[in-house]
Amino acid sequence: MNLTQLVLASHNGGKLKELQAMLGGSVTLRSVSEFSLVEPEETGLSFVENAILKARNASRLSGLPALADDSGLAVDFLGGAPGIYSARYADGQGDAANNAKLLEALKDVPDEQRGAQFVCVLALVRHADDPLPILCEGLWHGRILHAASGEYGFGYDPLFWVPERNCSSAELGPSEKNQLSHRARAMVLLRQRLGLQ
């Protein structure tokens, strides 16, 4: 597939920069913000459904191929929660409230039952009605700490223990995180599918 530019279905400048770095220079990512500030309602019941919904919407708005990601944290003890509701886990009150709610939900839960994984699904559509979106999933396994640790990252990063580095994901520098994360793992697969390896 020969793509020179994609619209990223996100208004988040940090995510645009992170994904552009992972994608490399042969494909230019543009923000959907160039075309509309309206975000679609995420009505899907899975990461896959929401990623496809966002990609189709961005392609419809821009007339260009579009890439979307839907990501979140799935905690084993909580049956996969907060899952697709990760960003709104504490009713839209932000990262600190989400982290506090998660710590409260896992209060007194021992380390061996605090397994979790960050999940990322990337969906690429060639056009808004693409019958066969390209889907790539990345998982990053770890566990939830009892207290926040680290200054980098965002979201649940300060609570997510990375066993292969013996630290939280918020203690990893951006370049190291961009090699290990769920989003990085999904992007490796997408680059392969696009023939960019």
Curated annotation (Swiss-Prot):
Keywords: Hydrolase, Magnesium, Metal-binding, Nucleotide metabolism, Nucleotide-binding. Belongs to the HAM1 NTPase family. Its EC number is 3.6.1.66. The active site is at 70 (proton acceptor). This is dITP/XTP pyrophosphatase. Homodimer. InterPro entries: dITP/XTP_pyrophosphatase (IPR020922), ITPase-like_fam (IPR029001), RdgB/HAM1 (IPR002637). Coiled coil: none annotated. It holds the Pfam family Ham1p_like. It comes from the Bacteria. GO terms for molecular function: dITP diphosphatase activity; ITP diphosphatase activity; metal ion binding; nucleotide binding; ribonucleoside triphosphate phosphatase activity; XTP diphosphatase activity. Mg(2+) binds at residues 41, 70. Pyrophosphatase that catalyzes the hydrolysis of nucleoside triphosphates to their monophosphate derivatives, with a high preference for the non-canonical purine nucleotides XTP (xanthosine triphosphate), dITP (deoxyinosine triphosphate) and ITP. Seems to function as a house-cleaning enzyme that removes non-canonical purine nucleotides from the nucleotide pool, thus preventing their incorporation into DNA/RNA and avoiding chromosomal lesions. It is an enzyme of class 3 (hydrolase). One of its GO terms (cellular component) is cytosol. Binds 1 Mg(2+) ion per subunit. Its cofactor is Mg(2+). Disulfide bonds: none annotated. Substrate binds at residues 10-15, 71, 154-157, 177, 182-183. It catalyses: XTP + H2O = XMP + diphosphate + H(+); dITP + H2O = dIMP + diphosphate + H(+); ITP + H2O = IMP + diphosphate + H(+). GO terms for biological process: nucleotide metabolic process; purine nucleoside triphosphate catabolic process.
